[in-house]
């Protein structure tokens, strides 16, 4: 079967207005991060599979292929681990504030509706153990969304240590842990009730309430503190309160104590961004203090934020924010011996472009088709208007 007119699953073409909007959003985001003092970093699209083996092998969402030496390589499925590789192998001095943008690739299942190719941008704050790193990440995300004029967005906080603490105290085998993870992610009330019956513990009240522990930050955090005496969970809740107090002036903040990230490297505060016009989150991040241990014997505190720029482009389009490209108002048809004069006229005239047609008639036909109001003919010794819409 010849597939030369088809696209691989989960990929798509972007034309004209959408392509320009995607490019402009990426520029805006990078400019905003640079203004906040982040240093840009770029990593290859192709990496050895070992860079991602601990996080992605189980879910098999990698695009794998062999290089010319028979080594297994992949298209990067995220940016965080490659940046961890760079930081741990180049000897750069910490702490660091890094920013990035580029393509990521995930081999999702067919018919799932997910995009396998995504444009992602984000930041990594490495070497700062202070909670100010989380605050900076969240405020940077809020600032970007405001700069992009995303309407009615909300930031949702969670804490990876809550789920980790529950799993640790329950001491579940791997298969049971995976089942429990799905119950929490799906907020299955009946499923969790059955789980608690089969796995009783001192956390029963807290676990039973987890599917409902989401909503207004202050209310939910206060409610959660009354459901447990476990010091680990209480410490995480207090940390969330500190973050909420620090950033709630900038945006609407909610919490979800059953928030579980797909990547297992998160260790502390986690967060997501939602909006009324978006079906899913377009912003995610959190703290992962053991990230560098995959590449070196030492660890370093780190917090990161990632933005799905394709989703943000769609959001802008739905909100009517994407501006139309300034239309061409002058088409310059020229004789070959008058290219210098034509080029000079184009450089001096805003919203003008050169005609590539052999005859003035074809140039005028093109102008009518694309609603260009004026066409001039540049000869070596003259410039003549040969079409003007009002005089048609």
UniProtKB/Swiss-Prot annotation:
Which keywords appear in this protein's UniProt record, sorted alphabetically? Answer: Amino-acid biosynthesis, Cytoplasm, Histidine biosynthesis
Q: Please provide the Gene Ontology terms (biological process) for this protein.
A: histidyl-tRNA aminoacylation; L-histidine biosynthetic process
Give GO terms: molecular function aspect only: catalytic activity, acting on a protein; histidine-tRNA ligase activity; transferase activity
Q: Which cellular component terms (GO) are annotated to the entry?
A: cytoplasm
> What pathway, per the record?
Amino-acid biosynthesis; L-histidine biosynthesis; L-histidine from 5-phospho-alpha-D-ribose 1-diphosphate: step 1/9
Cited NCBIfam families:
hisZ_biosyn_reg, PRK12292.1-3
What PANTHER family does the entry give?
ATP PHOSPHORIBOSYLTRANSFERASE REGULATORY SUBUNIT (PTHR43707:SF6), HISTIDYL-TRNA SYNTHETASE (PTHR43707)
Instruction: Look up the further comments and give them.
Output: This function is generally fulfilled by the C-terminal part of HisG, which is missing in some bacteria such as this one.
Q: Which family does it belong to?
A: Belongs to the class-II aminoacyl-tRNA synthetase family. HisZ subfamily.
Q: What does this protein do?
A: Required for the first step of histidine biosynthesis. May allow the feedback regulation of ATP phosphoribosyltransferase activity by histidine.
This protein's name: ATP phosphoribosyltransferase regulatory subunit
Task: Tell me what organism the protein belongs to.
Answer: Listeria innocua serovar 6a (strain ATCC BAA-680 / CLIP 11262)
Q: What phylogenetic lineage does the species belong to?
A: Bacteria, Bacillati, Bacillota, Bacilli, Bacillales
């Amino acid at each position: 079967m010849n597939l030369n007119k088809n696209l691989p699953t989960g990929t798509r073409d972007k034309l004209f207005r959408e392509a320009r909007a995607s490019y402009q959003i990426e520029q805006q985001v990078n400019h905003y991060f640079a203004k906040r003092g982040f240093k840009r970093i770029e990593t290859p699209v192709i990496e050895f599979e070992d860079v991602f083996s601990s996080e992605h092998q189980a879910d098999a969402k990698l695009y794998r292929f062999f290089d010319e030496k028979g080594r297994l390589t992949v298209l990067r499925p995220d940016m965080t681990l490659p940046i961890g590789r760079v930081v741990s192998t180049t000897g750069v001095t910490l702490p660091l504030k890094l920013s990035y943008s580029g393509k990521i690739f995930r081999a999702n299942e067919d018919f799932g509706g997910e995009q396998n190719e995504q444009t992602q941008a984000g930041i990594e704050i490495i070497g700062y153990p202070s909670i100010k790193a989380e605050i900076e990440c969240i405020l940077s995300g809020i600032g970007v969304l405001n700069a992009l004029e995303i309407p009615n967005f909300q930031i949702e906080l969670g804490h990876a240590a809550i789920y980790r603490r529950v799993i640790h105290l329950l001491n579940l085998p791997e298969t049971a842990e995976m089942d429990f993870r799905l119950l929490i992610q799906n907020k299955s009330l009946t499923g969790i009730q059955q789980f608690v019956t089969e796995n009783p513990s001192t956390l029963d009240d807290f676990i039973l309430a987890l599917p409902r522990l989401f909503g207004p930050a202050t209310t939910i955090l206060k409610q959660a503190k009354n459901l447990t005496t476990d010091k680990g969970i209480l410490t995480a809740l207090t940390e969330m309160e500190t973050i909420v107090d620090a950033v709630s002036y900038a945006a609407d903040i909610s919490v979800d104590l059953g928030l579980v990230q797909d990547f297992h490297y998160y260790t502390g505060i986690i967060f997501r961004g939602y909006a009324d016009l978006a079906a899913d989150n377009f912003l995610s991040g959190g703290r992962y203090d053991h990230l560098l241990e995959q590449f070196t014997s030492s660890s370093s505190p780190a917090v990161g934020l990632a933005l799905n720029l394709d989703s943000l482009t769609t959001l802008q389009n739905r909100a009517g924010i994407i501006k139309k490209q300034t239309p061409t108002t002058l088409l310059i048809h020229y004789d070959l011996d008058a290219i210098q004069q034509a080029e000079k006229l184009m450089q001096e005239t805003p919203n003008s472009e050169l005609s590539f047609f052999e005859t003035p008639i074809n140039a005028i036909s093109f102008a009518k088709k694309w609603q260009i109001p004026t066409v001039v003919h540049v000869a070596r010794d003259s410039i003549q208007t040969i079409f003007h819409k009002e005089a048609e």
